């Protein structure tokens, strides 16, 4: 007999007396022998291992107090006496965190225990055992802190779950992080995410099964393609794909052509400059021009005109701050233009003024053009996504920040541009912060370029210091006084009373359902409430009457306050002087729901007295322009807007402002790689901006619907967007601009983002194929950088073009880029849901539902019945029109990239919904979750979050079953739980072929994706087929991107095999758990289960039974244990309508094991079994699932 022997040393406290154990291993059986007790101190470490068999693999940690012996048979894990040493298996985002690099201790129960306590004797001993346990943990954590390489302690001990609160408090005092994952306790040096798939025993693994004969048919097409590949697909010359893209942007805000002959340049441009000068002077001298000049002189900016122009002439960078209404946005760019034209440099100057929003760029350009007596598109123009107006003589261009960034892709030095004005930098948008880094690097190479930064707040010093102490100038604003009414003031004067019930905002059934689902997961106070909790507790409202104080005690910080807003509006409409009302809300849901409520009001919903308008960034430009028009006499205009109305736009006739004090902004949880969309408190600067909108034309009133003490608790300024959003698109732009290392470049930002956020973004771009392992742009990445959409949506467009199913893919991408076209009126919700379900069919896809709705609208438009179609089907015609315009832009961009020639040729396979579903999967990945159908519910799990939910508006959100194993989704948002939006169900074959790279696992027939998070088990020959198809498919995409003229018909046999596989996969496989323990090895006869129990103590019976039931699609077995009079226990296990009674045993654990043993004996027919017999037992259980057999035993002994 060949033996291993080792001395084991556990975790002990100083001077503790323990027993050492000698371990003798014969093949796979383990026997333990106690040696005499030894006195061991923490400083002494046993480091000796004795191996008496050549070829044995002996591993140990020199720094930990865990010694492990691993058999040379290749077992995946090794354990000794309840201590396990293993490497953490983490998803790609969590692997980036160095905190999971090494596990110091991994304690687990050496035998299964029930979760239910029996008897009172254990409870009486809890206090003493807890103290001993905490002492042991204090030593473990001390050792963890001393060892620099070890990162965390992992325990599966039941006593540690029992004492987790105490252990967690101890860890916190020692500067460590703690979290409990189901039955596992983890203490770590690094912050811990909400979910760890490597510690999830219920993480699904997929067994893939294809219909009979499908694999052989697919293999035939594949082999035929491989045989003809060398002769059919010749080597084609490579070309730089970025060149064709760049050349296609010749008409996209290109600068003046640089003339080689300066004399010729002067001869041509001089007359044009004189012409512009003459035209400008004629306008100034005209009566209309004199009147406009007189108006402009009344603006505060005019007084600073000369000083501003002098500072710009003398400095390359100037920072200008100005209060709302001072005229900086409309006047300063004009002053520069007028100065250049007056100096006869009009034809050579080119001024670009960026705005953070489309509506701002359009409205400001129209205003400036009108002040110059011109039509838009002459000397003043604009360019935003989907539309623009500019001409040959346009010298001042207003555009969004994204437009300027896209120009930098093809014009790195901004040739011909003389001035760049970046407005609203105080908002700290991600594009604006990124643009500042790029411009800061560009200025030394362009000493003639002038940069003017404009802010609406007085934080100019921050930007001045960033640009090396650039001069900062301030324009004092002129606004009429605005009286502020905080919540306590309005309650005192109006007598309105707050109660628990009138603060429930009415979103209709849909929103109420979502809030109820979220409440199930709510375990702590919301961020809104906790942020102001201290301020409210310290507040003193003694100066107010009892009714007011009582209302304030009931005030809910989480409520937007629909009813309160309605009351304030009635107060204004009934008793206040004329003037428009601007109501600041958090987002479209709030605006739409409040608008519905107000329209149902007898006064506020009367169109003869009130004009209700909405203002949101996703609305069409024509709708947004309505807010600037003055209403008819006697009608009060009420505008419901988001925070975009703080500074970006100015509604001149606003006299009253209602401020809810909140804004819905995306924050980003880098540790869990999850965006969070929650209302948050605005900053003091934003509150002042909102208040200032009321004093434009006369003294105004501002109603802050929160107490003054809450305002005092606000942050001074808003957190930059760069620190609170995912960075994938930004990182792609950095690489496309050739700016070097992503992390190094972003470290130069005004306020650099978290390193983990950058790592997550880079890993994402690598997964979708935009970057290679060295962070270089791939051909796909170069194409993605030229498309004005998110990388995942751009990938869908490119693949749709390659595989000739572009038309529906353009519709999907356009729909995901704008607001959802499906409307959900409060009073017609059921009808709206019925209309939506009509488009969904049985495809289980929000994306294909969108395609059908759009196609129906296009058909209706051809017969001039589009409006009726939208009205009947609860669709937004404006959104559908925006989608239509965006589709045209996508087509033109792809055509310029030479990926398509005409719409007919690139949409030949648009009818193939299976192929379209595959393209959607390719774009959405790695946004994938598993779908496990249960009897009354559906369980969804993602890699970073564990269990998630679907929004009820999804076509998949209200179905009893989804007959697909996977969902790919566009977006996930954490509200209180994590919700998925815009999902499509896909099969195993679609995910394997169009998802991430697939690799072979530990044995034949085992495939892995996403670093092993997704695991698939199948026949080895089928695994080879998937690997071969995936390899050829990736090569096809690569060749097409490098050589856009490549004829895809050469790959017809390959595409036939792929289309056949994705269309005929019937999802006949199943999810299993713990499948690695059942890995296919050569069948070897074992002893019967009874003998196995004797040798191993029955430790595996409960686990084995659990695995069998899971594979057969049953729930977990239920154990009922009863204590008998003779201090023995008897247990009964129940599953699938079957009860099995075990024999009396000395402990509860052994009683449950014996009951599991009886169940396994029955399933095996009391015969000898092999590992292959597990499949037979699973099939037996599946048959029993449809029948309710007689119970094996129903009486207690």
UniProtKB/Swiss-Prot annotation:
Pfam families: DEAD (PF00270), dsrm (PF00035), HA2_C (PF21010), HA2_N (PF04408), Helicase_C (PF00271), OB_NTP_bind (PF07717). It catalyses: ATP + H2O = ADP + phosphate + H(+). A motif (DEIH box) lies at residues 423-426. It comes from the Eukaryota. Residues 564-738 form the Helicase C-terminal domain. Residues 309-476 form the Helicase ATP-binding domain. Gene3D superfamilies: 1.20.120.1080, 3.30.160.20, P-loop containing nucleotide triphosphate hydrolases. One of its GO terms (molecular function) is RNA helicase activity. Transmembrane segments: none annotated. Its EC number is 3.6.4.13. This is DExH-box ATP-dependent RNA helicase DExH3.
